[in-house]
Amino acid sequence: MRCLALDIGGTKIAAAIVKNGEIEQRQQIHTPRENVVEGMHQALGKLLADYEGQFDYVAVASTGIINNGILSALNPKNLGGLAEFPLKASIAKHTDKPIGLLNDAQAATYAEYQLQNFEQVSNFVFITVSTGVGGGIVLNQILQTGSRGIAGHIGHTLADPNGAICGCGRRGCVEAIASGRAIEAVSSQWEDPCDPKEVFERFRKNDEKATALVERSAKAIANLIADLVISLDIQKIAIGGSVGLAEGYLSLVEKYLQDFPSIYCCEIETAKFGQDAGLIGAAYWVKDVLLDKPEGTIYG
């Protein structure tokens, strides 16, 4: 079956035909920044028209939270005016094909899970450490989306009760300590300010301030991993994102994990899918859950 997959982010919307995990006819446009509600309706309509007659179903991976087809977020400001956008209904105006939607990190998780040996790994987590910290959880070979679509927002678990206020409004979330945004919040205040990319360059040169900042991030992720393993019996975790894949970061996370009792540890690997993880994961998930198992529940 051929899927029209859409990946809706804060700055771009990617679209492609996905068949058997392979990307075809990929295109990318800017997410509307002005008149955003009408602009999004128009953008979706154009993309559906571009691929008319070429797909059997639609799969959407989107930033934010998808609940009953409505787009929202823990921090609505991140959506730039698209909070409570009727995403599924907007797409349904242009096609009568089946439509499934889920969060982009959940979709990426499902893509990464397709590379695992299902018999050996039934409990799996994907963590993306980038501008923010997000992820997804697979338990008993089933991707967890939750009754409200929020399952997997692991970046908003507690890392430091005395830490910085997170964008979600809570104090001390993992995201407020480990993310690229959190790193930049500190490094931009230095006498010699820099962005996260340069922080890592300085870290690799053993700069004291940069090393302390990167270590702080890696410790938060190591503790997050330990919490996930001990609470959910996770067998393997894949780490991605611009921070998570930065040279030297994963080995630092693993170093801190070695300080814990072994029961808190599991196998860690780098994420294999790149920018198309959301497209591929959404296509697989909608096919597996909505089309191949019609008795299953679709959130989104």
From Swiss-Prot:
It catalyses: an N-acyl-D-mannosamine + ATP = an N-acyl-D-mannosamine 6-phosphate + ADP + H(+). It comes from the Bacteria. Pfam families: ROK. ATP binds at residues 5-12, 132-139. GO terms for biological process: N-acetylneuraminate catabolic process. Zn(2+) binds at H156, C166, C168, C173. Its EC number is 2.7.1.60. One of its GO terms (molecular function) is ATP binding. Keywords: ATP-binding, Carbohydrate metabolism, Kinase, Metal-binding, Nucleotide-binding, Transferase, Zinc. Gene3D superfamilies: 3.30.420.40. Disulfide bonds: none annotated. Coiled coil: none annotated. Pathway: Amino-sugar metabolism; N-acetylneuraminate degradation; D-fructose 6-phosphate from N-acetylneuraminate: step 2/5. PROSITE patterns: ROK (PS01125). Homodimer. Belongs to the ROK (NagC/XylR) family. NanK subfamily. Catalyzes the phosphorylation of N-acetylmannosamine (ManNAc) to ManNAc-6-P. This is N-acetylmannosamine kinase. It comes from Haemophilus influenzae (strain 86-028NP). The gene is nanK.
